[in-house]
């Protein structure tokens, strides 16, 4: 959610050389702060990174309720000031009121805050913690306690480095 493409286009137009240096996105920092894995077996294998429409619209097909219908893990940027509407759109898309959610304020900063809540309590939680901007909203059952263990470490699972054993 920046303007790097426009900046690179201008640099190219002006024949100014540049490098693009990769960084760690705040959505990864938020996962670390939450001590969470966004993809869990039989919970969610996809992560949707998006934002609410605000001063800048989003394409119609990327409306929050349509994306929420996938029931994937969602990481929502630039939407902290619209949490009542966000909750409504998430519920309209099929999440339940008690779906786990979190607000991560200033992920990876010294003054980081991590607030666990539900889809229904997003706005209330932000208000209680005086969070009005600079936060990510994470939604999905990846934040819950129910998941299946990965087959990767199951003794009967064969992969490149190990032949599975049959269980008795």
State the predicted function of each range.
Residues 1-53:
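Short glycine-cluster motifs
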Residues 2-10, 14, 44-46, 54-168:
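A contiguous loop/helix-start segment that scaffolds small-molecule binding in enzyme catalytic cores
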């Amino acid at each position: 959610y920046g303007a790097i493409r426009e900046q690179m286009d201008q640099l190219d137009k002006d024949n100014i050389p540049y490098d693009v240096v990769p960084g760690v996105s705040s959505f990864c920092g938020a996962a670390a702060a939450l001590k969470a894995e966004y993809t869990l077996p039989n919970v969610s294998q996809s992560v949707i990174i998006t934002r609410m429409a605000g001063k800048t619209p989003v394409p119609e097909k990327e409306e929050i309720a349509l994306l929420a219908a996938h029931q994937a893990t969602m990481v929502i940027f630039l939407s902290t000031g619209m949490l009542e509407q966000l909750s409504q759109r998430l519920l309209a898309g099929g999440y339940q009121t008690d779906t786990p959610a979190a607000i991560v304020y200033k992920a990876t900063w010294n003054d980081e805050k991590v607030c666990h809540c539900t889809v229904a309590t997003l706005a209330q939680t932000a208000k209680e913690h005086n969070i009005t901007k600079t936060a990510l909203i994470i939604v999905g059952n990846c934040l819950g306690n129910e998941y299946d263990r990965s087959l990767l470490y199951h003794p009967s699972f064969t992969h490149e480095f190990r032949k599975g054993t049959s269980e008795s």
